[in-house]
Amino acid sequence: MIGSAAAPGRVPTASPSTPSADPVLLAHQQALGVTTTILLPAGRPVSRPSTHDGVANGLQAEALGNEACQAFAAAHRDAYLFGANEVPDLDDAVATIERQLKRGAVVIGEQKFGVECDAPEMQRLYELAQEYDVPILMHWQFGMYNHGFERFHRMLEKFPRVRFIGHAQTWWGHIDRKHADQTVMYPKGPVTPGGLTDRYLSDYPNMYGDLSAGSGLNALTRDEDFARDFIARHQDKLLFGSDCNDREGGTEKCQGAKTIAAIRRLAGSKAIERKLLYENAKRVFRL
């Protein structure tokens, strides 16, 4: 049962790379105290504009695809689940993702491709997420992945029953109302409240935020006074994820461990901490 370990149960997201990395991933998540991990697959490797001629293959992180994630989860059923993914503008993208959903995938994503967020092919994925009642996780990165962040409210309004999870640099940069230079991926310094991300989380019940990766950690630590208030206001909308590229979980070099420490430092109460590390993910992923 999720959360039955001594440490608070956590539901992070991660991606396996090569089979030889399997023991490393298992040990990494165990060192963090993670009880359930959701693996996010890459789409198939193709060379086309939506993958920046192959740059985005493997989620630009040498991640493997649907079959590898499903197989890993099947081999470790007590602690691993899997997502479903595909390059969205391939003719069989919907069919590929739907096949994985029928096999038990619990999320669509991570969608990390060079397409407009409101393009017809993306809207077909939102419709699929709605049909199967699964969330869709989107990597927002200006100039590279999921274009049109300032228009995304239209999709939130058009698909109110879809649980959207925002992730990555542009998503977290926009906690700041003064985030004007979109090319700055990891902005530093004080945050002015009222940024687009802050408003999406406040105004749309179907919008959630994934605290993983360097972008999530940066958002928590660049202005900790703001972060405390941000967490308090959005305590039911934020989810911990690991998304580490290190090999030694739980050490001072481990990004996931730093994120957990920041959450514990800034949450304000054990009840809020548990929401971010466990309860919100359990609800959003229907576990």
Annotate each PLM feature.
Residues M1-T37, Q235-L239, N245-L287:
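Mid-to-C-terminal alpha-helical segments outside catalytic/metal-binding sites
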Residues G9-V11, S17, R44-A61, G173-V191, ...:
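Short, flexible/disordered intra-domain loops and linkers
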Residues R10-T18, V24-V55, D78-N85, A105-Q111:
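Divalent metal-dependent hydrolysis catalytic cores, especially in the metallo-beta-lactamase
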Residues P12-T13, I38-P41, G83-N85, G109, ...:
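Active-site neighborhood of phospho(di)ester-bond hydrolases with catalytic His/Asp-centered motifs
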Residues D22-L26, N66-A73, V94-E98, M122, ...:
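Generic structural signal for well-ordered alpha-helices
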Residues Q29, C69, Q100, I108, ...:
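Conserved, mostly hydrophobic/aromatic
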Residues S50-Y145, A213:
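Active-site gating/metal-coordination segments in enzymes
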Residues V106-V107, V115, A119-F240:
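Catalytic pocket-lining loop regions of alpha/beta-barrel enzymes
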